[in-house]
């Protein structure tokens, strides 16, 4: 199997062309005719991740956050140059899937959580189309116990919260990463909790005034889910060594 074959499989799986994304999905650096020898999957194509891909002897690196984004300057200098240089020196092909790996209904950063935690009455959630998030219901649980459950799932501590909702919860909406602005949409949906990665000042008063619990577990922690699920999927689909790289980014 070469990189072009892998890309064909990923495109069929993730349907990237239906998304208006913030950067290019698919092959960002490399040659599509390169044979796939070993695959590494990670959250972000930063220098540490690329170094670990080199150490793992992977020649394909699939990430959620690639190198190129809309509005970037054209010159390849500084940290971007260092990343690309290391990829090329070690013949690592870089593939990125951003919003498609948020929104996927079984492998994505959002739906995978809801499925793993046995939420029911699941439906798409968010203010953009295609919808990126998910909302659903579950057996009533104290908010502190719900936070502990999510912390164990994400293997990360709660980074920020504004507990404006009920102390006993049975519904939630979830969009991973930097989606704290979707808190208002969650309040409109009348769920008890909104779960995301990042937070900022407006989330505090919005949660308290909208009678909803806001929970942030970190951008990276909430966006490991999809890449990990994708790595497991590729292991089951192809007889090619596949590994997940975790740089332990606490943000």
From Swiss-Prot:
Provide the GO MF annotations for this entry.
Answer: metal ion binding
A Pfam family assignment: DUF34_NIF3
Read off the Gene3D superfamilies from this record.
Answer: NIF3 (NGG1p interacting factor 3)-like (3.40.1390.30)
Keyword Metal-binding: yes or no?
yes
Cross-referenced InterPro entries, in alphabetical order? DUF34/NIF3, DUF34/NIF3_sf
GO cellular component, alphabetical, reads: cytoplasm
* Family statement: Belongs to the GTP cyclohydrolase I type 2/NIF3 family.
- Assembly, per entry: Homohexamer.
Name recorded for this polypeptide: GTP cyclohydrolase 1 type 2 homolog
According to its UniProt entry, this protein's organism is Chlamydia pneumoniae (Chlamydophila pneumoniae)
Q: What is the lineage of its organism?
A: Bacteria, Pseudomonadati, Chlamydiota, Chlamydiia, Chlamydiales
């Amino acid at each position: 199997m070469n990189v072009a074959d892998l890309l064909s499989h990923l495109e069929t799986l993730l349907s990237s062309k239906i998304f208006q994304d913030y950067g290019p999905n698919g092959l960002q650096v490399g040659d599509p005719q390169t044979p796939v020898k070993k695959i590494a999957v990670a959250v972000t194509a930063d220098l540490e991740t690329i170094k670990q891909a080199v150490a793992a002897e992977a020649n394909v690196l699939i990430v959620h956050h690639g190198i190129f984004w809309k509005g970037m300057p054209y010159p390849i200098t500084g940290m971007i140059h260092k990343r690309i240089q290391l990829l090329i020196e070690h013949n690592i092909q870089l593939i990125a899937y951003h919003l498609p790996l948020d929104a996927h209904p079984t492998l994505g950063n959002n739906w995978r959580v809801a499925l793993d935690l046995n939420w029911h009455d699941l439906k798409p959630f968010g203010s953009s189309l295609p919808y990126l998030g998910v909302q659903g219901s579950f057996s009533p649980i104290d908010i502190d116990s719900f936070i502990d459950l999510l912390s164990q799932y994400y293997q990360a501590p709660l980074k920020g919260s504004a507990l404006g909702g009920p102390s006993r919860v049975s519904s939630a909406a979830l969009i991973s990463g930097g989606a704290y602005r979707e808190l208002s949409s969650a309040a409109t949906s009348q769920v008890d909790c909104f779960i995301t990665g990042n937070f900022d000042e407006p989330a505090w008063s919005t949660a308290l005034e909208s009678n909803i619990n806001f929970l942030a577990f970190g951008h990276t922690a909430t966006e490991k889910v999809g890449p990990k699920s994708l790595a497991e999927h590729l292991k089951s689909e192809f007889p090619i060594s596949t590994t997940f790289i975790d740089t332990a980014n606490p943000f």
